[in-house]
Amino acid sequence: VLLDCGNFPVSPFCNALNDLGLTPKDVKGILISHGHGDHINQHTLKISEAFDIPLHIHQKTYNVVSKRLNVSHSSKLVKHHNERAFRVNNIKVRAFETFHEGGYVGKPFGFVLEGVGERKFKIGYLTDTSAVSEEMVECLVDSEVLVIESNNDVKMVEDNDPRDSNWLQHLNNVEAADAVVKIKNASRGKNALKYVFAAHISSRHNTPKRVLAMFNEKFKKANINDIEIIITDQEEPTPVITI
């Protein structure tokens, strides 16, 4: 399952899968969080149609994407989801609403993925939100792996673009770290939050060093010492983990 697919033309997409020992046939679905172009664009639709990969997208998001791209995607490949759980092969997917505005956003969501059958796991995905609600925390409790945006450092924003309000649509380092602490403290599973991927890190308004410093500061105050923080990069592949 792919979570968003906005920056890969077909050939680099295939190459990236090949580096992982996979092919497009191994991808059984693409989940779309919202309608902004870095999450879904023409490349996404071409990949979906070229390899018959279903596109799981909310109706409101599909409507704005269709308008923005001026296209009509193959109806047999479009699966409209809501907040009810659905299956993609042996993975149960639950979508939950997030807070994100601006442009062709549609209706934004985060996701929880859980293994069905013998292989049990829980993965949480939360990016592109201006806040983290108690309902979101509840959804993400006991995730073994969490992908969460840590988009900006407030001081860097104030120094670089004090009049730019776009960053308010994303979690800053403090908000992201606080959310992780809340999720960890509410979890009961022994493997809860073994890995946290800090994602959607702004190249202009943030640095990996600032992300790590804030997460470690918050974890120390909360007496949390068993979470591995993995910094993601917009240009370089993220290390692969096994759960």
List where the protein language model places each region.
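Active-site HxH/HxHxD metal-binding segment of metal-dependent hydrolases
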Residues: 18-84
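Short, charged/polar "capping" segments at the starts of alpha-helices
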Residues: 61-67, 205, 238-240
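Short beta->alpha connector loops
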Residues: 7-9, 36-38, 99-104, 128-132
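Pre-active-site segment of Zn-dependent metallo-hydrolases
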Residues: 1-32, 41-42, 132-136, 176
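Active-site neighborhood of phospho(di)ester-bond hydrolases with catalytic His/Asp-centered motifs
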Residues: 2-6, 27-36, 56-59, 124-127, ...
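Metallo-beta-lactamase
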Residues: 58-120
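Cap/insert and terminal regions of metallo-dependent hydrolase folds
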Residues: 134-232
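Conserved beta-strand hairpin/beta-sheet module of binuclear metal-dependent hydrolase folds
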Residues: 1-20, 107-128, 145
